[in-house]
Amino acid sequence: MKNIKTTVFGMGCFWGAEEVFRKINGVVSTEVGFMGGTIKNPTYGQVCRGKSGHIEVVKIDYDPEIISYDELLDLFWNNHNPTTPNKQGWDVGEQYSSYIFYFDDEQKLIAEKSLEKMQENTDLKIVTIIEKAGSFYPAEEYHQKYFMKKNNSILNF
């Protein structure tokens, strides 16, 4: 069996975040959902109303022999604005915050170095939070692979 690893990113609306990663060679699967927060199994409505403290995230299972964690981080940084707190584009709210959730010390170290490198290249403050992964709560089915199902060309990734 292959050595599949997992990472979770919060980078605004999870529909677009999933679309960034789902077609990448080496990504085995993606799933959108919620992390952080104060209640178990939150609904999309609870998260959007700001009542749960959760972040919209994309969970990515990947084969590190095909794509590295560094490469996934590059996609993360290049597909959202890590300098705007609680906001991505038109989407405003705590649930749209920039987060990297790590699963082990190696991911933590790589993520921290990656953030330092990003900060060196901008005068703006990077507000991305790096945090140990906790419980992942999948979003409702209609949110999964949203743009693929809708065949929506609004996003040009």
Curated annotation (Swiss-Prot):
Keywords: Oxidoreductase. Its EC number is 1.8.4.11. One of its GO terms (molecular function) is peptide-methionine (S)-S-oxide reductase activity. SUPFAM superfamilies: Peptide methionine sulfoxide reductase. The active site is at C13. Disulfide bonds: none annotated. It comes from the Archaea. Transmembrane segments: none annotated. PANTHER family: PEPTIDE METHIONINE SULFOXIDE REDUCTASE, PEPTIDE METHIONINE SULFOXIDE REDUCTASE MSRA 2. Has an important function as a repair enzyme for proteins that have been inactivated by oxidation. Catalyzes the reversible oxidation-reduction of methionine sulfoxide in proteins to methionine. This is Peptide methionine sulfoxide reductase MsrA. The gene is msrA.
